């Protein structure tokens, strides 16, 4: 049933592209690719027309065949629940449109003046664009000297308009053809009209005329809107930037050089946004005459053809809009505003943060089940996390002909609310004056260009009789609780009284002499363990610490501590033959530096070899030293292996402890992959850098295979790594993968798991659920981490669970969510990742099985270079039917695996070809 609901919601979110009428039952399915853009910018256009004239409003569509459109007019005299003007529908919902849609206005009257809205929707979402129609009763034969002024004010501002004339006492003011009357809020003094505390109803066209004539001296288009921030909000909010004056705007009509109207909104100069977001830069300004604006990028003129995906230059709104930004959009963006009296400029810095794309994530536990009383109110909350702009719908499951499901098993629903994330309170569904018919299941559906997610909750409606019964039951329950609580408190008080009485009868003994007794003890700092090994079975040295202990309760005195490290001839390397070089990195308890070791190669004593040296920091503690020694001793008992970092020698005498290990010249696997990403990837690590080598798909499989071999060897030595990740795998000059960082590793001999009991920083995004929640570490928990490492490999160094807070990750893992298939991965290899992420540890494969499977895949593929523009199914030797994959072609973050035996969901394109949706519109 869960799979059916997911299939149904996928169709619903794509706006009924393949829908079926409930009444007629006739299908009209058509699989159409839709553009991310819906309406062409710049349409419809503002118009000014005389009474009795005609005008055509034009809306241009990008994909008319898959788009539905409707025309509205804003009624500024009526406000909706969110405080915005009510939209009055002028046409029904239009379908099967041409590329250009025209709404004609004929025989225009003064009542036709106002704002007209073109609203379109398709599977990509919704878009609205509007235009003002200004209606003039009559104009004088002589043209007015001043042009029409367009002003935008915020709620609560003061509007002051001046009409330039020699006869100020003979001026009358009209709004949309109706004379403006003087009242407590509107003051008309001679040729000046002042409106205090403006509201939405004050929006419109104002005209000043000479009394007794029909000569329009001047007209003003006024728009009142909410305060508009200068963040990177969506472009489809129908908001306008302030292009007019502030509270006192008398001086706007005199000659003046450009100036900023809202400098406080331009204080934020650095924008750091995730890739895929929409960015809007604003430079609200004015002047007289009205200035023009142009945009520069890094000091050069910036036009739409300079950027893939184009730009939107909304000059009348003083804004630059860029959709779906990528790292190549980074740079300095400057607006230059100028007229004949001067020019001003302002610069923004844009930094696009690298993110792997993902579908929306819904906060766990929301929406919640709700109970309401008949006639009361209720609300559902749905918290959405999404880098790309999401579209949200609220659905109610309904019954048709006595059934909640159609003949094909898909449930019936109706849409009760829809909108984008930046619309007012779209994440909240309000239900008022509830009746019994409102009871049922409600779903929150959120989707973006990558995919969709949904969660449901139930509304229970109680009658007054049900409420009375509930109250009686609660009162009875509370009575029982009070009785039991009173009895418990009485028992506790009795025990306390008895204890106090006994203390009075038997007074406490005199305390012992608390003089500190000093003694000297010598004890092992850490118990050493041995593992049977042909090469290093003699390594069982004890580390001793000498310290002064006090028997008093005061802290241990700061005395000299002496550590005794025994000399090991098999591993000791002369300190004078070692030349330290530049640092390579820092760990949790020490640092690693590059060094040259003379004679460390026993086969060639005269050879100078490059090594990596692990050592402690200056502020290291006893525990840090013990951890480094533990790692050293663990590496001693390991045989040489090609896919692990091997120990070469140690320096324990006459100086600080040095641990000499193999040097890997190409650094960590994570940075190795990132540095070799193709330049065409939207989230390339460095867009200016040409990859040193072009990786093949076989190279990626080889990386996973080599790491699996190294982990198979560690598992055979009963060693649990606990921090397996791409950052802890090093790459040599010959592209050999070597597992490193045994700082968190623990040897196991008689038990097969290690349970962590101390608190510390742990790699939570790589940890298995049993390690994360129960602190139990096994070889199977390392297998889980290996699955995450495979995901890193096939995303070329991507970050797991991008943009998900750690607290939210805990909930998602408990609910069974798993990461989706990377776009550069075959179905077969993704299934191996999913096996590694099995909720039951014993059901995960062993490293030996993983080595065998990856070896088989490696043998069956050829050296083909990566092409990230196409899916990787072509490289799969065994996955013939890709349509049944558990993930879409897009690279999203999560898929849900509530049950291990849950069947795979159909892909999106298969859904459209096989299923129909039954919906009704409220």
Curated annotation (Swiss-Prot):
GO biological process, one term: regulation of bile acid biosynthetic process
Modulation of this protein's activity: Present in an inactive conformation in the absence of bound ligand. Ligand binding leads to dimerization and activation by autophosphorylation on tyrosine residues.
Key words, A-Z: ATP-binding, Cell membrane, Disulfide bond, Endoplasmic reticulum, Endosome, Glycoprotein, Immunoglobulin domain, Kinase, Membrane, Nucleotide-binding, Phosphoprotein, Receptor, Repeat, Signal, Transferase, Transmembrane, Transmembrane helix, Tyrosine-protein kinase, Ubl conjugation
GO molecular function (one): ATP binding
Location within or outside the cell: Cell membrane; Endosome; Endoplasmic reticulum
Residues that, per the record, bind ATP: 584-592, 614
Extracellular side: 20-480
Enzyme Commission code: 2.7.10.1
Enzyme type, top EC level: transferase
A GO CC annotation given for this chain: endosome
Cysteines paired by S-S bonds: 59-118, 163-208, 283-335, 382-444
CDD domains given in the database record: IgI_2_FGFR, PTKc_FGFR4
Biological role: Tyrosine-protein kinase that acts as a cell-surface receptor for fibroblast growth factors and plays a role in the regulation of cell proliferation, differentiation and migration, and in regulation of lipid metabolism, bile acid biosynthesis, glucose uptake, vitamin D metabolism and phosphate homeostasis. Required for normal down-regulation of the expression of CYP7A1, the rate-limiting enzyme in bile acid synthesis, in response to FGF19. Phosphorylates PLCG1 and FRS2. Ligand binding leads to the activation of several signaling cascades.
UniProt record similarity statement: Belongs to the protein kinase superfamily. Tyr protein kinase family. Fibroblast growth factor receptor subfamily.
Protein name, entry field: Fibroblast growth factor receptor 4
Name of the gene encoding the protein in the UniProt record: fgfr4
């Amino acid at each position: 049933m869960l799979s059916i609901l997911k299939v149904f919601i996928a169709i619903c979110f794509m706006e009924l592209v393949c829908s079926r009428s409930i009444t007629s039952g006739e299908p009209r399915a058509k699989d159409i690719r839709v553009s991310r853009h819906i309406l062409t910018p710049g349409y419809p256009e503002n118009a000014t027309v005389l009474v009795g004239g005609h005008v055509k409003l034009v809306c241009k569509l990008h994909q008319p065949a898959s788009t539905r459109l409707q025309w509205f007019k804003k009624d500024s005299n009526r406000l909706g629940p969110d405080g915005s003007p009510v939209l009055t529908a002028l046409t029904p919902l239009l379908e099967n449109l041409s590329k250009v849609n025209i709404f004609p206005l004929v025989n225009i009257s003064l009542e036709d003046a106002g704002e007209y809205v073109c609203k379109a929707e398709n599977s990509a979402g919704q878009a609205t664009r509007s235009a003002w129609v200004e209606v003039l009763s009559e104009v004088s034969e002589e043209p007015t000297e001043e042009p029409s002024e367009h002003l935008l004010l915020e709620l609560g501002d003061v509007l002051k308009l001046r009409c330039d004339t020699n006869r100020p006492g003979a001026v009358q003011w009209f709004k949309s053809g109706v004379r403006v009357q003087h009242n407590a809020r509107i003051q008309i003094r001679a040729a000046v009209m002042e409106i205090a505390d403006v509201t939405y109803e004050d929006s419109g066209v104002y005209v000043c005329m000479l009394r007794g004539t029909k000569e329009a001296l001047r007209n003003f288009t006024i728009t009142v809107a909410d305060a508009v921030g200068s963040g990177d909000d969506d472009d489809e909010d129908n908001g306008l930037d302030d292009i007019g004056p502030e509270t006192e705007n008398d001086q706007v009509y005199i000659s003046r050089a450009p100036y900023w109207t809202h400098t406080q909104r331009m204080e934020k100069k650095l924008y750091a946004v995730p890739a895929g977001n929409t960015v809007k830069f604003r430079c609200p300004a004015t002047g007289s005459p009205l200035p023009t604006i142009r945009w520069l990028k890094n000091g050069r003129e910036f036009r739409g053809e300079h950027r893939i995906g184009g730009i939107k230059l909304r000059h009348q709104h003083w804004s630059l809009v860029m959709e779906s930004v990528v790292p190549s959009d980074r740079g300095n963006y400057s607006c230059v505003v100028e007229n004949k009296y001067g020019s001003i400029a302002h610069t923004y810095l844009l930094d696009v943060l690298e993110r792997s794309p993902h579908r929306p994530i819904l906060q766990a536990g929301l929406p919640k089940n709700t109970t309401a009383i008949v006639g009361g109110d209720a609300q559902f909350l749905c918290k959405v996390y999404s880098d790309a702009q999401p579209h949200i719908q609220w659905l109610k499951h309904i019954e048709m002909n006595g059934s909640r499901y159609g003949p094909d098993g898909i449930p019936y629903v109706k849409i009760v609310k829809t909108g984008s994330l930046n619309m007012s309170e779209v994440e909240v569904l309000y239900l008022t004056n509830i009746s019994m018919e409102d009871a049922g299941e409600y779903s929150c559906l959120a989707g973006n260009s990558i995919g969709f997610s949904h969660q449901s909750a139930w509304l229970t409606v109680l009658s007054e009789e049900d409420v009375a019964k509930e109250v009686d039951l609660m009162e009875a329950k509370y009575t029982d609780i009070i009785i039991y609580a009173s009895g418990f408190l009485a028992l506790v008080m009795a025990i306390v009284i008895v204890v106090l009485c006994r203390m009075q009868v038997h007074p406490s003994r005199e305390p012992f002499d608390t003089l500190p007794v000093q003694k000297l003890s010598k004890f092992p700092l850490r118990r050493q363990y041995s593992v049977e090994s042909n090469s290093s079975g003699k390594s069982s040295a004890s580390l001793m610490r000498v310290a002064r202990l006090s028997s008093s309760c005061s802290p241990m005195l700061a005395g000299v501590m002496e550590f005794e490290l025994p000399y090991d001839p098999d591993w000791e390397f002369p300190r004078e033959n070692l030349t330290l070089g530049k640092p390579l990195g820092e760990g949790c308890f020490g640092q690693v530096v590059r060094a040259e070791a003379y004679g460390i190669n026993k086969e060639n004593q005269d050879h100078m070899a490059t090594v990596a040296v692990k050592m402690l920091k200056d502020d290291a503690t006893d525990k840090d030293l013990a951890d480094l020694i533990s790692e050293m001793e663990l590496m001693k008992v390991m045989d040489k292996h090609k896919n692990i970092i091997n120990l070469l020698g140690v320096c324990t005498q006459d100086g600080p402890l040095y641990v000499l290990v193999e040097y890997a010249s190409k650094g960590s696997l994570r940075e190795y992959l990132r540095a070799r990403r193709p330049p065409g990837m939207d989230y390339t690590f460095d867009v200016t850098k040409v990859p040193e080598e072009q990786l093949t798909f076989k190279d990626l499989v080889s990386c996973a295979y080599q790491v699996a071999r190294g982990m198979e060897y560690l598992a055979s030595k009963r060693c649990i790594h606990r921090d397996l990740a791409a950052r802890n795998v090093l790459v040599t000059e010959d592209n050999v993968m070597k597992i490193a960082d045994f700082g968190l590793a623990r040897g196991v001999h008689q038990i097969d798991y290690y349970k962590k009991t101390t608190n510390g920083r742990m790699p939570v995004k790589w940890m298995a659920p049993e390690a994360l929640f129960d602190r139990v570490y096994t070889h199977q928990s390392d297998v889980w981490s290996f699955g995450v490492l495979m995901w890193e490999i096939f995303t070329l160094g991507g970050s797991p669970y991008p943009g998900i807070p750690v607290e939210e990750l805990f909930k998602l893992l408990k609910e069974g969510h798993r990461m989706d298939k990377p776009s550069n991965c075959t179905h077969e290899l993704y299934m191996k990742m999913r096996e590694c992420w099995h909720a039951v540890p014993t059901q995960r494969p062993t490293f030996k099985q993983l080595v065998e499977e990856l070896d088989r895949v490696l043998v069956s593929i050829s050296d083909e270079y990566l092409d990230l523009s196409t899916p990787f199914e072509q490289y799969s030797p065994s996955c013939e039917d890709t349509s049944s994959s558990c993930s879409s072609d897009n690279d999203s973050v999560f898929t849900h695996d509530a049950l291990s035996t849950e069947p795979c969901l159909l892909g999106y394109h298969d859904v459209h070809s096989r299923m129909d949706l039954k919906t009704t519109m409220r």
